[in-house]
C-alpha cells in the first residue's frame, strides 16, 4: 500500500506570469548596454606549441597588423583555413582589429605552425586580462595544448602501426 507523502497542493505556474519562480529559469540575465573595453596598455606575451612547431607571440594594442617572421598573415599563411583558425581567439573575444600581433615561428609544417600561433595568441590574450579574457578562451578550448605528435616507427613494422602482410602458411 502506498502512503501519502503530504504533498497534495501542487501549484503550476505560467512562465510569463510574475509569480513564476526565478530560480527555475535557465536563462542568464543579460547585461544591457554593458560592453567590455580592454584596458591593457603594454605588450602581452604567449608561447604556443603544436606538433613540433613553436610560436612566440607578442600582442600589442594597435590597428590589427600581423607580422609573422617579418611577413604579413596573408603572405605567411596563404591558406584561408589557416588564417581563420589563427584569428579565432580574437574573434571569440571580439577584438578583431584591436591588437597588433607579432610572432616568431619555427619548426613543424604549416598546419602545426598555424595551431601553435593560435595557441600562443590565446595564451597572450589570456595573460593580458585574465579576469575577462581567460574564461571564454578556456571554454572555446584555445588554451588547451594539443599534445598529439607523430608516433615513432617501430622495428619490424612498415610504419608506426602498419605491419607487413601476414601469411598463415
Swiss-Prot record:
SUPFAM superfamilies, sorted: Ribosomal protein S5 domain 2-like
Ribosomal protein in keyword set: yes
Region (Disordered) location: 1-29, 128-169
InterPro entries linked to this entry: Ribosomal_Su5_D2-typ_SF (IPR020568), Ribosomal_uS9 (IPR000754), Ribosomal_uS9_bac/plastid (IPR023035), Ribosomal_uS9_CS (IPR020574), Ribsml_uS5_D2-typ_fold_subgr (IPR014721)
Pfam families in UniProt: Ribosomal_S9
Molecular function GO labels: RNA binding; structural constituent of ribosome
GO aspect biological process, one term: translation
Record field: compositional bias (Acidic residues): 9-21
GO cellular component terms, A-Z: cytoplasm; small ribosomal subunit
Sequence ranges of Basic residues compositional bias: 150-169
Name this protein carries in UniProt: Small ribosomal subunit protein uS9
Lineage summary: Bacteria, Bacillati, Actinomycetota, Actinomycetes, Streptosporangiales
Gene for this chain: rpsI
Amino acid at each position: 500500500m502506498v502512503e501519502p507523502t503530504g504533498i497534495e497542493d501542487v501549484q503550476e505556474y505560467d512562465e510569463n506570469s510574475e509569480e513564476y519562480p526565478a530560480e527555475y529559469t535557465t536563462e542568464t540575465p543579460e547585461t544591457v548596454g554593458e560592453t567590455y573595453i580592454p584596458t591593457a596598455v603594454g605588450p602581452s606575451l604567449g608561447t604556443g606549441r603544436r606538433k613540433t612547431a613553436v610560436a612566440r607571440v607578442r600582442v600589442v594594442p594597435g590597428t590589427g597588423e600581423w607580422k609573422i617572421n617579418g611577413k604579413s598573415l596573408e603572405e605567411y599563411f596563404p591558406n584561408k583555413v589557416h588564417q581563420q583558425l589563427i584569428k579565432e581567439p580574437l574573434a571569440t573575444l571580439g577584438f578583431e582589429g584591436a591588437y597588433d600581433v607579432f610572432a616568431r615561428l619555427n619548426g613543424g609544417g604549416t598546419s602545426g605552425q598555424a595551431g601553435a600561433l593560435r595557441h600562443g595568441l590565446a595564451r597572450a590574450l589570456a595573460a593580458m586580462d585574465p579576469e575577462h579574457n581567460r574564461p571564454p578562451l578556456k571554454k572555446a578550448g584555445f588554451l588547451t595544448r594539443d599534445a598529439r605528435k607523430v608516433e615513432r616507427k617501430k622495428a619490424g613494422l612498415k610504419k608506426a602501426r602498419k605491419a607487413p602482410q601476414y601469411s598463415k602458411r
